[in-house]
């Protein structure tokens, strides 16, 4: 930040570059204060042999983060057109506001969290990523969901549930994991590995013999995580599943998969 003015670039670009750096500094301080609480706020370049700096209070660090993000949000552009130094995916005004909303939420400052989040929402630049149709493999999985969920009994729209589930899954896949995705506010792009494959989904999560991949069924959510989610009515916690009911569910799935392998 201190040496940007020495660079050969336009004044406009210098101002924006400083704002980008301040964004990441605030991001770093957010991580630090979440781990350690009180940390030293350093905004100037220090010599190697500088004396030890006293830590600032938690309140001071939090105010610094929220103030920095609010200020850089007024400097950063809403979007980028592409090209050198204007690459799509760089920090935008709404990335700063989104991070500010998250920080304020962590700090228990709900008024500021709502204010910053509403600014992002009202911009109209972002929306949930939604699939409009399913491929053959997804259709098969959707059919198997009836083994787990009685949609009619729970009053759940199966089509919306299934498309919502697969939309969330597809959100992270390579073809959709780009700055062009309407749900992405800030992205970190990297080179993909052509040898990578979806091992976790087909081995650790899927029950044994549920598919030709022979899952391990070793990654399962703890009950505390399950209970952290609301039921379809948005209010009450789900009832505990009894052992006999769990046993019956597993037998139903096992028999279904066994019949598939015999066919």
Where do the model's predicted regions map?
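Solvent-exposed loop/turn segments at secondary-structure junctions
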Residues: 39, 47-48, 191-193
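An aromatic- and glycine-enriched ligand-binding surface/loop that stacks and positions planar moieties
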Residues: 93-97, 104-263
């Amino acid at each position: 930040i201190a040496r940007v003015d020495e660079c050969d670039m336009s004044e406009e670009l210098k101002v924006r570059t400083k704002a980008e750096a301040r964004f990441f500094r605030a991001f770093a301080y957010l991580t630090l204060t979440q781990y350690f609480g009180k940390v030293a706020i350093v905004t100037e370049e220090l010599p190697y042999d500088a004396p030890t700096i006293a830590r600032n209070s938690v309140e001071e660090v939090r105010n610094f983060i929220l103030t920095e993000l609010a200020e850089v949000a007024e400097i950063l552009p809403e979007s980028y057109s592409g090209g050198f130094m204007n690459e799509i995916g760089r920090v935008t005004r709404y990335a700063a506001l989104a991070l500010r909303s998250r920080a304020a939420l962590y700090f228990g400052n709900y008024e500021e969290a709502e204010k910053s989040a509403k600014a992002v929402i009202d911009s109209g630049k972002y929306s949930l990523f939604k699939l409009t149709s399913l491929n053959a493999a997804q259709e098969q999985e959707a059919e198997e969901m009836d083994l787990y969920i009685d949609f009619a009994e729970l009053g759940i729209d199966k089509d919306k549930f299934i498309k919502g589930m697969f939309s969330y899954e597809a959100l992270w896949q390579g073809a959709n994991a780009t700055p062009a995705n309407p749900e992405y506010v800030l992205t970190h792009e990297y080179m993909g590995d052509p040898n990578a494959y979806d091992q976790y989904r087909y081995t650790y999560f899927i029950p044994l013999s549920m598919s030709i991949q022979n899952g391990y069924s070793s990654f399962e959510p703890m009950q505390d995580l399950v209970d952290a989610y609301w039921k379809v009515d948005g209010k009450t916690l789900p009832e505990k599943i009894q052992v006999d009911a769990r046993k019956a569910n597993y037998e139903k799935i096992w028999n279904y998969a066994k019949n598939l392998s015999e066919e």
